[in-house]
């Protein structure tokens, strides 16, 4: 069974969504995990759009959980956000 997961980092809300690539016609790629990052859990609950620049696909949930916070830090620095 494939389970999605979510966590928070520096006020951002991250949803990790598994996708079986066989459904996209690429069974050789197995299952990938995509990060959907929102400015807050409230924005996620309000069905706001995710931050497109932080949407990435990874080969494992561990890779997503390790790299997404790094990408968020870069995003904060690039956009000079106060977090």
Predicted regions and their residues:
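Weak global preference for isoleucine
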Residues: 2-3, 14, 31, 51, ...
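Hydrophobic beta-strand residues in large extracellular and virion-surface proteins
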Residues: 7, 14, 33-39, 60, ...
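Short aromatic-glycine-(Arg/Gly/Cys) micro-motifs in beta-strand/loop hairpins
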Residues: 27-51
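Negatively charged, low-complexity tracts enriched in Asp/Glu with abundant Ser/Thr
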Residues: 1-23
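Surface-exposed beta-strand edges and flanking loops
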Residues: 5, 16-18, 37-41, 76, ...
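Mixed-charge, Lys/Arg-enriched low-complexity segments
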Residues: 43-83
């Amino acid at each position: 069974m494939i389970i999605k997961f979510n966590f928070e980092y520096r006020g951002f809300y991250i949803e990790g969504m598994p996708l079986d690539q066989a459904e996209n016609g690429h069974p050789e790629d197995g299952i990938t995990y995509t990060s959907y990052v929102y400015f807050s859990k409230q924005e996620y609950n309000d069905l706001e759009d995710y931050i497109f620049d932080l949407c990435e696909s990874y080969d494992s949930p561990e890779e997503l959980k390790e790299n997404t916070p790094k990408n968020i830090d870069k995003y904060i620095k690039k956009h000079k956000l106060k977090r």
